[in-house]
């Protein structure tokens, strides 16, 4: 079981999303009111439960399960995990709550994208009883310990149903996907590398930029990424994502003007990414490449979707 101790209070459990290590993680905040941030998809729930067991935590002790947004790789397992955590309440953005109570649209949308792979990747998606859902919105707080009151920020850009969570004790921020993706596979090579996540179908570049700049202004000490792990250099990480975001939008606009496919746009995006990795000394083939290729494909789809809606 892959568990990383990030500090005295926060542990990261690898959910092996898509069968990949260091893809999507669940954060465990060891406060008086034990809190989990992100469940991952349903196939990750067994990994989360095993991780809690190894940490000496019983499922009865879990008080809050928070999902930053309702995309299935972050929240698909919420209903399944909640079934085994009898004392837990699920915390979600107001625009996401009804879709977790009645996930039929989430399921239909994912089936349309993933087809025959849906069952292996996401099943089962269990509805969350409405009485076990609590909504948090901009400026709301959640007291989870005598000295810890989590603060919720509305952080659109990746999705409209997205919030981030400020942890005052570590001066850290749980970014979900709004501040992009951290490629943990490159850390062993001494390389900090981040890309934006511009996936469909609610990507909004201006909102994403504003959310990231708000994080920058907070002078944080750590960022906790949904994909994947903790960055101890928040300003540099956020600046990197903003620079790539500008380039992604430029390339997306050009691809849309030329009526290119998502595959063609993904290749456009891959060229500067590969060039920068080569500059940083990354030798190919590298185990990070399947992650990056997958992310660029999804980001290309979101960029084209955005420009179609603007026309």
Whereabouts are the PLM-identified features?
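Conserved beta-strand hairpin/beta-sheet module of binuclear metal-dependent hydrolase folds
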Residues: 2-55, 165-177
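Metallo-beta-lactamase
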Residues: 5, 41-43, 61-73, 100-156, 160-224, ...
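Residue-level marker for buried hydrophobic side chains located in beta-strands
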Residues: 35, 66, 90, 172-174, ...
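Metal-dependent catalytic neighborhoods of phosphoester/phosphodiester hydrolases
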Residues: 75-85, 103, 235
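Active-site/pore-lining binding-face segments in mid-to-C-terminal subdomains
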Residues: 206, 211-268
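C-terminal regulatory/interaction regions
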Residues: 250-311
């Amino acid at each position: 079981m892959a568990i990383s101790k990030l500090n005295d209070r926060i542990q990261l459990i690898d959910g092996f999303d898509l069968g990949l290590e260091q893809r999507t993680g669940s954060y465990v905040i060891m406060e008086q009111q034990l809190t989990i941030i992100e469940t991952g998809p349903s196939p990750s729930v067994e990994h989360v439960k095993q991780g809690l067991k190894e940490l000496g935590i019983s499922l009865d002790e879990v008080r809050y399960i928070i999902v930053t947004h309702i995309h299935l790789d972050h929240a698909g397992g919420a209903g399944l995990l909640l079934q085994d955590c009898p004392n837990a309440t699920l915390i979600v953005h107001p625009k996401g709550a009804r879709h977790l109570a009645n996930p039929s649209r989430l399921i239909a949308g994912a089936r349309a994208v993933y087809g025959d792979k849906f069952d292996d990747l996401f099943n089962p998606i269990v509805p969350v009883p409405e009485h076990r859902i609590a909504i948090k919105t901009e400026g709301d707080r959640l007291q989870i310990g005598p000295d810890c009151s989590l603060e919720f920020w509305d952080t659109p850009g990746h999705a409209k149903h997205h919030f981030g969570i400020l942890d005052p004790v570590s001066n850290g921020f749980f970014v979900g996907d709004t501040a992009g993706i951290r490629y943990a596979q490159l850390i062993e090579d001494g390389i900090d590398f981040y890309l934006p996540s511009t996936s469909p179908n609610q990507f909004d570049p201006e909102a994403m930029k504003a959310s990231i700049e708000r994080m920058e202004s907070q002078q944080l000490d750590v960022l906790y990424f949904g994909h994947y792990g903790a960055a101890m250099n928040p300003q540099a990480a956020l600046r990197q994502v903003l620079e790539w975001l500008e380039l992604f939008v430029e390339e997306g606009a050009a691809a849309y003007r030329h009526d290119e496919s998502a595959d063609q746009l993904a290749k456009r995006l891959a060229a500067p990414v590969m060039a920068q990795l080569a500059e940083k000394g990354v030798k190919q083939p590298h185990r990070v490449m399947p992650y990056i290729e997958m992310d660029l494909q999804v980001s290309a789809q979101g960029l084209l979707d955005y420009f179609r809606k603007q026309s």
